[in-house]
Amino acid sequence: MTDRDKAEIFIDEPRRRTPVAGRYDVIVCGGGPAGTAAAVRAAENGASVLLLERQGSLGGTWTGSLMTWLMDVENKSGLLDRLTDGICSLGSLYCRQHGDYSFCPEDMKCVMEQMAVEAGVSLLYHTMLAGVITEVPQGGGVPAVKGVITESKSRRQAFLAPVIVDATGDGDAAAMAGCSFFMGEEGTGRMQPMSMIALVCGLSVRDVRPFCLNYESCPGEAQRHFQELFASCGIRLSYSMPVLTHLKGDLFSVSLNHEYQVPCDDARQITDAVIRARAEVLGALHKLAAADKRWESAIIAHTADAIGVREGRRIRGNYTVTREDLISGRTFEDGICDVTFNVDIHVSGKTGSGSWDDGGVCVKPYQIPLRALIAADVRGLVLAGRLISGDFYAHASYRTGGNILKIGEAAGVLAAAAARTGVAPDEVPFDVVREVLGSGIGT
């Protein structure tokens, strides 16, 4: 490659007029667990809501990335109860250790979609966020959101709303709007690995029961047995504690892959990680089928449409949840989610020992305040999901499914209240949010 090839080359695009395709009270960017919860709650509280999703279904990490188990679900009533009831009615909800749940991703897609439609949410699939429209007040000050720009089969369009919820997972909307953010561990920059999960069918539950998290008698037992099985067949994995979960009938999910130090904002590196990950997953399972009779009838039904991302941008909010908050078990007057999950930091490199560590943090039950869901740098922008304002260690605790759903609910209630009353999210009285979310939050 020549120096000229290495130099940045730009193209000046012609100025263009983008048609406004709709006006709403609230626009939610991202239809994962947090985004769906935010959209449903906002719509149920009187807001007109547009939910934008780049894939063809709701659920995000739970469905597109096949993360088929829910953790930290205690004290998370509300939408979680409605979701689990719906999935249970379809016959795919299994209780795991410590009260966690596993589920069939197709059932989750159906239940979440029906929930959104019944709430009156306007869904727009196969739509990419291309920009966030902001406006600086006359005389200067903090910019305010006015809408978003999208790209899809309908070409380039604009949608307007006074309140936007960023539920993209990686904080794409906030970054486009000019918000400051953090990535990785403070001081080192290390980031948690990505993972490719697969669905496997054709197995006998009786034959693989010792390897299933659903049926283990003590934490970690099934993963150790599963790792020993691969090792006995001469198969070395990038993830030293592989996971097998029974979902429904003869359907299982398998997680055995780690992709290290892949930034969430680099499409080339993510693509390379996906190619490596899929090759490892397919190769390992084919070798296992050839080496162990219990696995010879296994059929790899599906690999995830999107590689699972544990960590991306963490957007600066009006409060940042910290390691110290976890250690002290801090509660807040505006607490919206009770978190009990440990710090779960998957090793950041192949040379690491074990599969995860707690960073030396002993977590006491703590709360996430509503202020951590309000972007500090842009007016009208609400944060939902793992991208809320927190440090590396706090994020490694609250990023699990039960918490993400509850954070999404609070974001939706806040967004609807702000849009209805014509004020900024940080001007909405917390009692308004508390009243809708119900008991069990706050101090």
Question: What does each of the following model-derived ranges do?
Answer:
Residues 2-7, 15, 23, 41, ...:
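Conserved N-terminal/central alpha/beta ligand/cofactor-binding core
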Residues 27-29, 38, 43:
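Membrane-embedded transmembrane-helix bundle of lipid-linked glycan/lipid transferases
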Residues 20-32:
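Beta1/beta-strand and adjacent pyrophosphate-binding region of the FAD-binding site
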Residues 2-8, 16-17, 61, 140-142, ...:
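Flavin (FAD/FMN)-binding glycine-rich loop and adjacent Rossmann-like elements that form
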Residues 35:
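N-terminal Rossmann-fold NAD(P) dinucleotide-binding loop
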